[in-house]
């Protein structure tokens, strides 16, 4: 160890001359109550007042969260800083204190809101306020606690981490108990309860891990090291481990009533000696070895103290302890002699078991420096007197060995209640006294006789008392006897004491219990254990077998004991005691030797207590049984939805493994069977959304902005999210076809599912006609109305469930009409989250329903026949127009005279083919899709061939001035007809482009333009030298006709009318067109849309803005002119300019002539 002269850094603040001032590196830090005082008070509070309600909330405020300021929080940090000699950096320190201050302020608001609500629990405003305050408090703690575990400072921050963790668990318990009365839905409450049980383990494991890390860090070889080691162990047991050991009691479903816990761990005051410093090299291991190894708890009855003398000084040389087992259930036993049996004075017997035991010692120390000659050349460090004070409500006199002293044990282990005298408010009582000694002969350098006082928490009662109105936890270290093969081992740090261990079958232990309730009172037993093997527990009372049950392994062999290694299990069969004083026996059987079984405690629970776990089991059993049509689980009830099965599965998953593991497994298998039956009757492919657009002809198809998300509090499995769209002609969509082969003739089918929230969600079922609903489901925080109880934890209001029926007439596999299932959103504010979709057989059609579907089917067939007749005519005309564009049936070359207007005219005739796509969603092919796509593909080829002949890039200026060289000022403007045109407003401006050509080939330069005002507009083509030609444009009013101008102003308009020319956007196609239906109220009343099949074609309003409708005619006044040009080199230049006024150019084309 480093012998730093600045030794005050290792001195605990509560051992200084002024307990109100702490010293750290020369700083003076003013404090109020010490962290140990506060922690002892908190532990007492948790042991005695662990009942949820305003009393508990306000108690936490009074003890810590309402009285602490920055200096008090800083004291918690200083405490561990001094022990481990590590200073927290200023930033981390200030951040931690600021967070603690914020939590304190927020919790005071929470506590006041809780108090007001408890006084008026039905007040809606106060209920809402509690929901707000809980959410704020939970969010703040969730954010803050990781900051108390910041890297490199986990140990110095450990005590404040535990304080914040304790607060968080208390708040989560509040919502688990009172959340429904505050207005939270069952799903939220269950989720927060799951957080509670998970965080109990997480917070516990963090605290124990870093406690052990800090303890290892302060260990050293010398006595001074041991002093610091023991101080760390003692103080962090009080400020960390004791509090952590009570965390499991926050589980409100396992401990729904008052629960009494006991702390049986022991802590040790430092050896009461002067000059007990680092001069005793190598003595740390010896001092630690003088402490008792793990053992059963016993009751200290008396101490017989022996006295010896040295150089005329009398001192405590040795002693013998007499003790009794817990409950005084056996004969008194005597421990071996500690120290030596001195005879310099008569032995003195201190009776320790008076009142509530010895709570305080006041010791006198004796230190004599060595002389230089003979026997006197020795150092003497001993105890020459001690006063033993009894804890009692009366003035019971103390017992004194020789004399009282000034070394007060309360300086190291303060009372837990400073509002009463220490004899009443003490926190610990003396449990044992051992001795560290050194120097056994006259040749020894020093003589040390150091009594080692062990202390146990006062909650560890002398008897094992079982009342009728509370859950009683009894650590098994309070057993009377251990079974052969059972041992006591050191506890893992979070059990509040040591634990028992067995590695072979047999009796674990027996303990004496005293029943204060009437013997008619019935109880259930629970066991907290950890095991590497499956095993069977047996219990008996006074030799009478009571319970026997099989329980599973909780950990793997060789793993460390952690919070999650332990499980609390119970027997369902209640029992009663026959005698007021009985012997309870616990045994473990049916496992192979060599495995490890650890037992922490047993619990006696009044049988009248209705546990949440029992209620959950009954509710889950009822919910599972109601899924099926009969008790043998052959079939599902028709009205049982897939979503409902998932919620029942959630209910089963939430059952306690500790309380009903076997029943949980059985119910889980039944629910899985129900899920399989649900999947079998569901005609949808991939109902769980494993993917969209994975296969061309199977499963779900959808737009690219749909997302698949995993399960959450609402959905157990995958669900989809549909977002709004900025263009109603490009909706968000999801669809699937039910194959004809899956359908039965004259049967009604139902589409149903669950919507978490939606706006403007349109749902379609399409066969002979379109069934359509628009569904708006508000996404409120509560999915279950407050006025109605939720039958299942995560089930929601029925309005979140939707269903839509469709009737099927006769079926025809060749026709393969099937049923289209479509979900669509076409508004900007629209959205939806939905899942658990089903399409299933509902019932055969009879009576009026049968007649109605036959009538609808006949109308549909009549309409289909008429459509086929019309289609034959339209197809013939369209095909002729398309064929006329090409030179042959291979469709690989255009006719020499084919121009853009002819292609547009043919395209328009192709688009006159009806029912190419469903008007409800134009990405779904209709009955004429094949012939339409055949002709549309040739139109696309025609456009491609035509584009290949035009060697000018961006000749229509749709990409602005890209590819053009510009001099002066020009603009590209979008006209009212949505066409982009080049505007040359000044005579000095010029636009040009260099074009590569094939020398010796012929080209046609074609320009469509309009001239405003006087002057001429010119489009010139030329090479480097000569070979120049141009097209000139003037205002049509002048009626000038130029050479080579083959079309006049009026001619162009006439050409447009002749071909009805419109332009198709080849990039967009028709994959977004659909019917625009007005929204209907979400009353779920289905209606046939028969007139869509009787009144003619279902119009698609987006069609005028899509496909060929994108090409709009030019206004009157535009002129198209062309000339022939034969380049002599491989480059030509196209130049655009004007002499006066404004020149407007729609397009420039340079077309390669056919050979």
Swiss-Prot record:
Q: Which GO terms describe its molecular function?
A: signaling receptor binding; toxin activity
Alphabetically, which GO biological process terms does the record hold? sporulation resulting in formation of a cellular spore; symbiont-mediated killing of host cell
Task: Kindly give the Pfam families that the UniProt entry links to this protein.
Answer: Cry1Ac_D5 (PF17997), Cry1Ac_dom-VII (PF21463), Endotoxin_C (PF03944), Endotoxin_C2 (PF18449), Endotoxin_M (PF00555), Endotoxin_N (PF03945)
Matching InterPro entries, A to Z? Cry1Ac-like_dom-VII, Cry_V, Galactose-bd-like_sf, Pest_crys, Pest_crys_Cry1Aa_dom-IV, Pest_crys_dom-III, Pest_crys_dom_I, Pest_crys_N_sf
Q: Which domain of life is it from?
A: Bacteria
Q: Which UniProt keywords apply?
A: Sporulation, Toxin, Virulence
- Note on file? Toxic segment of the protein is located in the N-terminus.
Q: Which family does it belong to?
A: Belongs to the delta endotoxin family.
The function of this protein is: Promotes colloidosmotic lysis by binding to the midgut epithelial cells of many lepidopteran larvae.
Q: What is this protein called?
A: Pesticidal crystal protein Cry1Ab
Q: Which species is the source of this protein?
A: Bacillus thuringiensis subsp. aizawai
């Amino acid at each position: 160890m480093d012998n730093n002269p600045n030794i005050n850094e290792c001195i605990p603040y509560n051992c200084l001359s002024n307990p109100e001032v702490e010293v750290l590196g020369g700083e003076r830090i003013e404090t109020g109550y010490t962290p140990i005082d506060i922690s002892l008070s908190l532990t007492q509070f948790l042991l005695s007042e662990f009942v949820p309600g305003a009393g508990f909330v306000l108690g936490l405020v009074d003890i810590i969260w309402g009285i602490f300021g920055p200096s008090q929080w800083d004291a918690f940090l200083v405490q561990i800083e001094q022990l481990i000699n590590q200073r927290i950096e200023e930033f981390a320190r200030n951040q931690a204190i600021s967070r603690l201050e914020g939590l304190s302020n927020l919790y005071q608001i929470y506590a006041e809101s809780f108090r007001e609500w408890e006084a008026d629990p039905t007040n809606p405003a106060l209920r809402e306020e509690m929901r707000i305050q809980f959410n704020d408090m939970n969010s703040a703690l969730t954010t803050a606690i990781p900051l108390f575990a910041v890297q490199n400072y986990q140990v110095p921050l450990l005590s404040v981490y535990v304080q914040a963790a304790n607060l968080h668990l208390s708040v989560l318990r509040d919502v688990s108990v009172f959340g429904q009365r505050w207005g939270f839905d069952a799903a939220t409450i269950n989720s927060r309860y799951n957080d509670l049980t998970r965080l109990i383990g997480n917070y516990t494991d963090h605290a124990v891990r870093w406690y052990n890390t800090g303890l290892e860090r302060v260990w050293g070889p010398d006595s001074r090291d041991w002093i610091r080691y023991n101080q760390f162990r003692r103080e962090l047991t009080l400020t960390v481990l004791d509090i952590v050991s009570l965390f499991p009691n926050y589980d409100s479903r396992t401990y729904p009533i008052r629960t009494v816990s006991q702390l049986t761990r022991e802590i040790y005051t430092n050896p009461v000696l002067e000059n007990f410093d680092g001069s005793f090299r190598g003595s740390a291991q010896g001092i630690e070895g003088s402490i008792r190894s793990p053992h059963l708890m016993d009751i200290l009855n008396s101490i017989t103290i022996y006295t010896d003398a040295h150089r005329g000084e009398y001192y405590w040389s040795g002693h013998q302890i007499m003790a009794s087992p817990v409950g005084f259930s056996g004969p008194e036993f005597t421990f071996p002699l500690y120290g030596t049996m001195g005879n310099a004075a008569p032995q003195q017997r201190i009776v320790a078991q008076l009142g509530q035991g010895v709570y305080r010692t006041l010791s006198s120390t004796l230190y004599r420096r060595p002389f230089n000659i003979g026997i006197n050349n020795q150092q003497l460090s001993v105890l020459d007197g001690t006063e033993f004070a009894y804890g009692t409500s009366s003035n019971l006199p103390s017992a004194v060995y020789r004399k009282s002293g000034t070394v007060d044990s309360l300086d190291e282990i303060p009372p837990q209640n400073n509002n009463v005298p220490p004899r009443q408010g003490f926190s610990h009582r003396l449990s044992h006294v051992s001795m560290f000694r050194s120097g056994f002969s006259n040749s020894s350098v020093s003589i040390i006789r150091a009594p080692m006082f062990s202390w146990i928490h006062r909650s560890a009662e002398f008897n094992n008392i079982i009342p009728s109105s509370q859950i009683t936890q009894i650590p098994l270290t309070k057993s009377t006897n251990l079974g052969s093969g059972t041992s006591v081992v050191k506890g893992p740090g979070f059990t509040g004491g040591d634990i028992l261990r067995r590695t072979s079958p047999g009796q674990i232990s027996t303990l004496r219990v005293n029943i204060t309730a009437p013997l008619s009172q019935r109880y259930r037993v629970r066991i907290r254990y950890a095991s590497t093997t499956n095993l069977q527990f047996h219990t008996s009372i006074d030799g009478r077998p009571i319970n026997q049950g099989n329980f599973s392994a909780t950990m793997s062999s060789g793993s460390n004991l952690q919070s999650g290694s332990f499980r609390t299990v119970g027997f369902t069969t209640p029992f009663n005691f026959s005698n007021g004083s009985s012997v309870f026996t616990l045994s473990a059987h049916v496992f192979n030797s060599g495995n490890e079984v650890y037992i922490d405690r047993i619990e006696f629970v009044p049988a009248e207590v209705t546990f949440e776990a029992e209620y959950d089991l009954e509710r889950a059993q009822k919910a599972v049984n109601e899924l099926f049509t009969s008790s043998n689980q052959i079939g599902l009830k028709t009205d049982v939805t897939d979503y409902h099965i998932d919620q029942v599965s959630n209910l089963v998953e939430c059952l306690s493994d500790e309380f009903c593991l076997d029943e949980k497994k059985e119910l889980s298998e039944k629910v899985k069977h129900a899920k399989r039956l649900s999947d079998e009757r569901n005609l949808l492919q991939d109902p769980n959304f494993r993917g969209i657009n994975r296969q061309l002809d199977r499963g779900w198809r959808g737009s690219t902005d749909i997302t698949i998300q995993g399960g959450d509090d609402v959905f157990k499995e995958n669900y989809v999210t549909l977002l709004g769209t900025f263009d109603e002609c490009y909706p968000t969509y999801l669809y699937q076809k039910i194959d004809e082969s899956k359908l039965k003739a004259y049967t009604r089918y139902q589409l149903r599912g669950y919507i978490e929230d939606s706006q403007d969600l349109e749902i379609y079922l399409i066969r002979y006609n379109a069934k359509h609903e628009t569904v708006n489901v508000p996404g409120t925080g509560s999915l279950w109305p407050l006025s109605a109880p939720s039958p299942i934890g995560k089930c929601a209001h029925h309005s979140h469930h939707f269903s839509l029926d469709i009737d099927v007439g006769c079926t025809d596999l060749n026709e393969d009409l099937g049923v289209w299932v479509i979900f669509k959103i076409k508004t900007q504010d629209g959205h939806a989250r939905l899942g658990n979709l089903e399409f299933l057989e509902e019932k055969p059609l009879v009576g009026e329903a049968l007649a109605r579907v036959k009538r609808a089917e006949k109308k549909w067939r009549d309409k289909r026949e008429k459509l086929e007749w019309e289609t034959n005519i339209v197809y013939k005309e369209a095909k002729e127009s398309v064929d006329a564009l090409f030179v042959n049936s291979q469709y690989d070359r255009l006719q020499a005279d084919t121009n853009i207007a002819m292609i547009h005219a043919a395209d328009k005739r192709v688009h006159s083919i009806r029912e190419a796509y469903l008007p409800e969603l134009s990405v779904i092919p209709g009955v004429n899709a094949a012939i339409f796509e055949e002709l549309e593909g040739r139109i696309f080829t025609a456009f491609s061939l035509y584009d290949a002949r035009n060697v000018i890039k961006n000749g229509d200026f749709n990409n602005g001035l890209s590819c053009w060289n510009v001099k002066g000022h020009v603009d590209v403007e979008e006209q009212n007809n949505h066409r982009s045109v080049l505007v040359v407003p000044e005579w000095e401006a010029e636009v040009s482009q260099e074009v590569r050509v094939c020398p010796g080939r012929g080209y046609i330069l074609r320009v469509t333009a309009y001239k405003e005002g006087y002057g001429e507009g010119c489009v010139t083509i030329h090479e480097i030298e000569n070979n120049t030609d141009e097209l000139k444009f003037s205002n049509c009013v002048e009626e000038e006709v130029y050479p080579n101008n083959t079309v006049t102003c009026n001619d162009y308009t006439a050409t447009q009318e002749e071909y009805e020319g419109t332009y198709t956007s080849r990039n967009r196609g028709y994959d977004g067109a659909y019917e625009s239906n007005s929204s209907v109220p979400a009353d779920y009343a289905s209606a046939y849309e028969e007139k869509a099949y009787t009144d003619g074609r279902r119009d698609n309003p987006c069609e005028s803005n899509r496909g060929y409708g994108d090409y709009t005619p030019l206004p009157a006044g535009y002129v198209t002119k062309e000339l022939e040009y034969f380049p002599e080199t491989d480059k030509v230049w196209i130049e655009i300019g004007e002499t006066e006024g404004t020149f407007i150019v729609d397009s420039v084309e340079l077309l390669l002539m056919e050979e």
